[in-house]
């Protein structure tokens, strides 16, 4: 805020005055000695700028004066420390006028022209505060350190006085409109404030500029009327916010001036018609104002050398008779030279300007506070985010005990590594097995622990025994003696092929026939026809159930005798599956077909884009016939589970006098058809009659097997996959002849049996059909759901058995409880007697119930129903259906609407069958509750209390039904609670066998709007009555008596202590007697 004071001196550059070296050096030396810390290479102002040294200086003078020092290297932290230092100085006894302004060390000014002078002046203000602090420290009892040499400051104070004299010299131009204040002698005992924040002094114009971040323009601050006389100042004052002296430390240090002051034009520095020459821009006025600032702070009254002599600045005109009262000179413009310098209007105008400045200062303080709080909240947010980031880093690094959590969250790499490790362990254990049974056990154990999925199977490595030829040892005995039982595990295909085909063919002489091989087949299967049939079919997957299933999962044997030849076939599937029974008809989805023909000796290879045809021609006149068929399994049939079925049947008849080998390498194109044709001459048909389903003519010259490879073939790693076709024709040696497709990285074991002296043709194919896979998945899912359903049913049956067992226990315990309760009742119940008149009243009024009139009798049938219903309800407690039953019971009780427990005590014979097992109210000695009104109406809160199971006597076990009853009351709606009479509440709650039926009471206990007495049942009338609205209790004053001793309770002048115990009114004496007798209470 620019000060409206301006002088000619301000128009020229101001040279900084050299600071008085003795005062600076003394102050720095004293601070270093007291705090024990050095300024180092910092100058005086820089060393004190952060306020840390000042706060430590205060703590050294008086320990604990500054409790917390902010050591952050930020300007706002330094400002906080300086404010704490100034507050501590006040506590040491320094006056506010002796303290410097926080902005004297925290420079926020952006003015360049006055920076040197401003710097020097502010440092002098700091030195003066240190001077007074040293003076206070010398007189402080808690301080015993180095004393400040006050004489070193004399030069500083003298120079400041001299500067003041120069500034206040009357040799000024008329255009120098700066203020000259005369000091009041009343201020001689105190120091003027270096903060320049006196309330009524115009010095406060400068103080705001030293504290604000930006200097507002005079247009903002000096608002006024256009007439230049401030005529709206009076109406403007009530709407201005006056500063809070306690809150605003700047305004708190302003001392008041006792006299009214003359006014100046409110907007005298704004350019207008009446005042055009007086307007000078704000920065120029500010220069002069800041030169005056330190002068105003150091008059003779504030000087330690000036004593009590007031400082005079030349001639002055007192306004009042008081010789010591002073006022400020007028700031006259040329047009206003005639205005009296000490007029009241000017002082009012100055006061108005001060108010405006205070408002601006308050606004600045509010903005600063808001900025601090926003900065603090942002800092807290940043701290929280930093903590969260560190926490996440710890989580990712596995620190801070989070490794346990990570155990359950595995990465994909960990899962794959664990799977591979398991497979390696399985391979090693399988290879090291010493017998077939041990190997089967190992595999079965693995299957039980882990699901053998496609991914697991495709990662199983091919055992070494399957990598060599089986032509020399084709018998099953060789397998039994084989040290490597891994021959049953599937090969590893990388990547897993969508389609894999392995054709293994063994061709033997037609003259050899072994009929004993048919012993291994399950049931006679369909004969094979020479027509093209599917050879590759997918199989559904399921886990084997025993060790034999394990073997059959990998291997299926099928044998058939055709035309005097025995064909033994084995098939290994790409997906593990149980054995399947042969289908009796071919399906339409015949995906892969094979046709085999033999024409002659030359080997012909035809290849085009669509197919590869391999013709192997053998010049042999021996009649031969090749027939190979495979039947496609229908996946959704029950035949999937048949272990003894044959999956495919093949027949190849070959006769040769000498073995011949034909080998060809085929590079597969995408749709590929391989033809292997074996021409045959007329052949003996002596065994044709054995064929049951032969569909081709018997004189068929050739059988064809056509293999169509779909385009879904996944190529292996080798750049050019090969198909090697090898036909060793052996005369009498049982040797396996294999047709291999090595591009699948697989070789399959030759099928044989120890019973077979000759080798028969064999074909092995694997295939994968997405449709079959989907069906297999559906079937597996259905199986899992069925197993889950069965397990759930078993659990339900088990729970039902336990529930029935608990029911029996509950009934037995209930029976014993009834017996114990009956004994207690017989010992403690006192017969209830009523007079004949009250009995008549009972009989006449007991029929008033909701919707129906009921005789006041003991309804034994209802009591039986109640008992059965309670038992039924109790039996269902174990099944978590209490709430439903309680609601049902409460509805039933409301529908009955009758009070079924009527006059149980009229006969004096307690009905044990109607006793509720949880009602312990009758266990009190002497049955005090069976007096005139044993069932004083209970509201829902009472019912909840009376149903508490803790009120049972020592020899009676509490049940769970009281809790159910309390829940029953809680779930009632408030309207239902209001509708129920206290009697009905009690009936819905625990039953008392000795409780007589009170007078008939309607739900609102009123007849035609009249309240009924809870004791005698008659309307209250107009007489005196005792009404307890919260409990729905109403009594005639004569009926308001103790239910035990029958003493009057309403006639006491000084008041009566009435207890309501178990529905009865008890006087204090009876209540204390029953309590001392150890009887339980529900209240």
From Swiss-Prot:
Protein name, per record: LIM and calponin homology domains-containing protein 1
CDD domains hit by this protein: CH_LIMCH1 (cd21278), LIM (cd08368)
PROSITE patterns to which the protein is assigned, alphabetical: CH, LIM_DOMAIN_1, LIM_DOMAIN_2
Region named Mediates interaction with MYH9: 251-639
Gene for this chain: LIMCH1
Assigned protein family: Belongs to the LIMCH1 family.
Gene Ontology CC: one annotated term: actin cytoskeleton
Domain LIM zinc-binding: 1011-1077
Coiled-coil blocks: 354-439, 782-823
Cellular compartments annotated: Cytoplasm, Cytoskeleton, Stress fiber
Organism annotation: Homo sapiens
Polar residues: compositionally biased ranges: 269-278, 932-951
Residue ranges, compositional bias (Low complexity): 204-213, 835-855
Residue numbers carrying Phosphothreonine: 215, 402, 472, 529, 537, 724, 900
Keyword tRNA-binding: no
